């Protein structure tokens, strides 16, 4: 199951006592700030969580899986996420007891 923005807003409503509209606006505003920073070419660093980086990928050869035809894959810019040490440690600790 995935965590949604609506669930995040609901959590803010329940834990901080914000009204639902304000909680939803806070979540939307948070993600809009991240989007705008990435669109303008900035790195996003969330201490204790991780970093969102932009990475330029060069054009490379590819293949159409249906026809087998060789086709070039265009150069593009992609967003990558690198989890921070604290996040990695918490996920590892949470998953170590599940096996």
UniProtKB/Swiss-Prot annotation:
Please give the InterPro entries that the UniProt record associates with this protein: Hist_DNA-bd (IPR000119), Histone-like_DNA-bd_CS (IPR020816), IHF-like_DNA-bd_dom_sf (IPR010992), IHF_alpha (IPR005684)
Q: Extract the ranges annotated as region (Disordered).
A: 49-71
Q: Which Gene Ontology cellular component terms are annotated? A: cytosol
Q: Any S-S bridges, and between which cysteines? A: none
Q: How does it assemble?
A: Heterodimer of an alpha and a beta chain.
Query: What does this protein's UniProt record list under function?
Result: This protein is one of the two subunits of integration host factor, a specific DNA-binding protein that functions in genetic recombination as well as in transcriptional and translational control.
Give the UniProt family note. Answer: Belongs to the bacterial histone-like protein family.
Instruction: Name the chain's protein.
Output: Integration host factor subunit alpha
């Amino acid at each position: 199951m995935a965590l949604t923005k609506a669930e995040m807003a609901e959590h803010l409503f329940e834990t901080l006592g914000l009204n639902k509209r304000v909680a939803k606006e806070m979540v939307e505003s948070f993600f809009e700030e991240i989007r705008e920073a990435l669109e303008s070419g900035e790195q996003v660093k969330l201490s204790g969580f991780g970093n969102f980086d932009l990475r330029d990928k060069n054009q490379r050869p590819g293949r159409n899986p249906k026809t087998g035809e060789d086709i070039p894959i265009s150069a593009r810019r992609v967003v990558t996420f690198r989890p921070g040490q604290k996040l990695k440690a918490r996920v590892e600790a949470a998953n170590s007891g599940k096996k």
